[in-house]
């Protein structure tokens, strides 16, 4: 099949997906699994790196004969479930799980579930461009700086594990009307997928695209019902969910939610009417926060509502310990690898009016963010850069690389950590991490050359120091070559970047 034919097939597929729901109700996704070009698109390098998440590593070996053989099996109705007729043959089952047929079929199936939302994203890209910076993780902290300092309480929520596969299929059927595709999804969930693995943050050899799709459909269902107080609908497509794939969720202010929901449940939400409805919600991965400036009765009511929601709608036993209610000004909260809190000592802002006619002193609360140094040192110790006390050690695994490669690896990790935690209010912890990585790099090089650490540092000198410069330090060093090497005073202020779309697990150790 030529590239021109594949492109024409893709255009036909796009037109097919844009048909009204009634026209594609019986032939929505399942018939497309019998088309060869779908598997070509899955394997194609350009589409592997989707805009939704990074490359997940498909099989490098691709043969049209395998695809045609799989399609012929499906045409002849040789179902995968027939392999399970003999459960005593465990080798056959294991071979089926690891077979290339299953990988092709699951990859094509998840690809077909993803593309409709991709076209929806393209059709609304003009709206996205106006708020493109909101895709960055750091954008949510700028939102916190403007709004959380004026609020009183925060509800810290750990989202439960996904429910039973059958319940998950029942929830997905609200936005997928193809019965055949749902049966195939049920087969994948019951026979191949571990539901607990849907929320794991570790890299796995499983089909990550398929797992991310299922997990985000579960989150979408939860948040659409969770925002029923605002929209009076049980199956809401949230404004933030232009696509249903993992990225930081950015919500605006929820205003007047009591009036929107009062018509349906006046008795249950009677106490909400007398409170200030200013409320903010944010989520990343399996953790979310709900902040409000309401009274003492508002947040416990929300906690009671959330617990009953998980138990009644998803049939999950939700432990109340997973929800914590605290005051923002006295208890910090942990979100997106940052420790956030409100400064105990407010900042004084003095306003001058009409040339010394009078002065106005305003106390302003400052939103602060800190680096979680203990978890980062734990990650460094797990990656064999230091011990649990933070003392640098050599990394023998990298001793076989060249000197420039070793220095570049350590320097890249250091720069990535500095880049992500550039919004920290205090940079002292970051320089401690830089010290650990720099000394670990020197110990690794000294181990490679069978030299002492002191002698190696004296011979290497400035070359080792320059590789660990951050982007801000590099600009100053190039502009002022005679500047002091002690650059700890550089970039004391917080810097938020709008090019960070995911947490890279402490620079991919």
Curated annotation (Swiss-Prot):
The name under which this protein is listed is Maturase K
Taxonomic classification, please?
A: Eukaryota, Viridiplantae, Streptophyta, Embryophyta, Tracheophyta
User: Where's it found, cell-wise?
Assistant: Plastid
Please indicate if the UniProt record lists Plastid as a keyword.
Answer: yes
Any idea what job this protein has?
A: Usually encoded in the trnK tRNA gene intron. Probably assists in splicing its own and other chloroplast group II introns.
In terms of InterPro entries, this protein maps to:
Domain_X, Maturase_MatK, Maturase_MatK_N
One GO process term, biological-process aspect: RNA splicing
A single GO molecular function, which one? Answer: RNA binding
Query: What GO CC annotations are associated with the protein?
Result: chloroplast
């Amino acid at each position: 099949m030529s590239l021109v034919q594949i492109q024409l097939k893709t255009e036909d597929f796009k037109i097919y997906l844009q048909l009204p729901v009634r026209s594609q109700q019986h032939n929505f996704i399942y018939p497309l699994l019998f088309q060869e070009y779908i598997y070509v698109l899955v394997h194609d390098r350009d589409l592997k790196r989707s805009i939704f998440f990074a490359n997940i590593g498909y099989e490098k070996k691709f043969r049209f004969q395998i695809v045609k053989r799989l399609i012929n099996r499906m045409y002849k109705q040789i179902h995968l479930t027939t392999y399970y007729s003999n459960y005593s043959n465990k080798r056959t089952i294991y071979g089926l799980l690891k077979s290339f047929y299953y990988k092709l079929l699951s990859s094509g199936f998840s690809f077909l579930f993803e593309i409709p939302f991709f076209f929806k994203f393209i059709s609304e890209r003009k709206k996205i461009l106006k708020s493109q910076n909101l895709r960055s993780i750091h954008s949510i902290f700028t939102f916190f700086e403007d709004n959380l300092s004026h609020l009183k309480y925060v509800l810290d929520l750990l989202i439960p594990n996904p429910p039973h596969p059958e319940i998950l299929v029942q929830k997905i059927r609200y936005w997928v009307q193809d019965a055949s595709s749902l049966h195939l999804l049920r087969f994948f969930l019951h026979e191949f997928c571990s539901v607990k693995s849907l929320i794991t943050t570790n890299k796995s050899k499983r089909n990550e695209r398929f797992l991310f799709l299922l997990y985000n459909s579960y989150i979408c269902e939860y948040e659409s019902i969770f925002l029923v107080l605002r929209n009076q609908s049980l199956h809401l497509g949230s404004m933030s969910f232009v696509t249903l794939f993992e990225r930081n969720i950015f919500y605006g202010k929820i205003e007047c939610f009591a009036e929107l929901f009062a018509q349906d449940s006046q008795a249950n939400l009677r106490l909400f009417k007398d409170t200030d409805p200013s409320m903010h919600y944010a989520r990343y991965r399996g953790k979310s926060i709900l902040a409000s400036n309401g009274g003492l009765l508002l947040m416990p009511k929300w906690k009671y509502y959330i617990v009953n929601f998980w138990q009644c709608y998803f049939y999950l036993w939700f432990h109340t310990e997973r929800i914590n209610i605290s005051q923002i000004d006295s208890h910090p909260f942990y979100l997106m690898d940052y420790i956030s809190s409100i400064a105990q000592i407010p900042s004084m802002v003095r306003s001058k009016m009409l040339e010394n006619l009078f002065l106005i002193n305003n106390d302003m609360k400052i939103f602060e963010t800190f680096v979680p140094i203990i978890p980062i040192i734990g990650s460094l110790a797990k990656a064999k850069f230091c011990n649990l006390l933070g003392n640098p050690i050599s990394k023998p695994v990298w001793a076989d690389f060249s000197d420039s490669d070793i220095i570049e690896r350590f320097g890249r990790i250091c720069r990535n950590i500095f880049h992500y935690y550039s919004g920290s209010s205090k940079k002292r912890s970051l320089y401690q991490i830089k010290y650990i990585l720099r000394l670990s790099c020197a110990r690794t090089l000294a181990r490679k050359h069978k030299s002492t650490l002191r002698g190696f540092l004296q011979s290497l000198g400035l070359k080792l120091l320059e590789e660990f410069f951050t982007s801000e330090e590099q600009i100053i060093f190039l502009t002022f070559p005679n500047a002091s090497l002690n650059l700890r005073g550089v970039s004391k202020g917080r810097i938020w970047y709008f090019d960070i779309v995911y947490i890279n697990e402490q620079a991919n150790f």
